[in-house]
Amino acid sequence: MSEQPAVAAGQAVLVTGAGSGIGLATVQALLQAGHPVYAAARRPTHLQMLQDLGAHALPLDVRDADQVQAAAQHLQHQGLGLWGLVHNAGVGGLGVLTSWSDTDLHDLFNTNVYGPHRLTRALLPLLLAARGRVVCIGSQGGSITSPFMGPYTMSKHALEAYAACLLQELTPHGVAVSIVQPGAVATDIGDNGRVANVARLQSTAAPFDAAAAAVLQVLHEAPALQSDLPESNSNRRYASPQAVAQVVMQALFDPSPQARYLVGTRWEGDRVVQALTQRLLDAARSPSHQWTEEEFLAHCRRAWRDA
């Protein structure tokens, strides 16, 4: 890369996975609003592109503890502090749950869960000093799951718990924590792991082989959106990365940010709320509770009023 641009004074924000998709859209939104941005990415082509946009390009693989520490030291030496940390770097993955090797599962968690933890820990002194913000890019898969999406949604469930605990621990010290839950978004996260996904699906053994073949067909021949038909699992409406980035901006700069932002279509939101409601019902009906319908509804009404 050529010489880095100077990082302007102000509310500096670090965005991981900044080379494409939601990360790139967030960098662009931040720059447009006049904020200094540390744009973290792995690929040299992405780093050069981010630098050309006016961001401070930061080589960073969140799986690499040495790179994480080097990034933290670099920010310390810049002397600008750090207002916001956006955990966007992530990987996906398809395949029947039992087809995943220990190594593949660990690699996925290393990026999606351990990576945010490493970076938060390294940058915590700066965030505490600024009384700033941490924003985790989760997924609606952090609340629900579906066949062939097990490991990915496991990692997003873990990130949900991580963000919830971090919120409780950091709020007393002035740092706000939010998690953004997009639904289907037009990004290249699926393309990045396409070769591994196809290989895993092609090698799926009975009794899961027929279902895996159906998923493979969708990967190879993704059906066009039927705008005149209701949205469904097979007829999805994709949000733009820019729409998610605007929600990230709210989480970063609203005076009273929400703990959770659900982003997507009404169909996606209904699906999440229904799944969470079923989980509540399962707990309320457990042998140790056995709530009546009225007790359950009274609890929901109180929660709604207190929110």
Which residue stretches match the model-derived regions?
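Active-site loop-to-helix junction immediately N-terminal to the catalytic Tyr of the SDR YXXXK motif
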Residues: 100, 145-153, 165
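SDR active-site lid
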Residues: 172-257
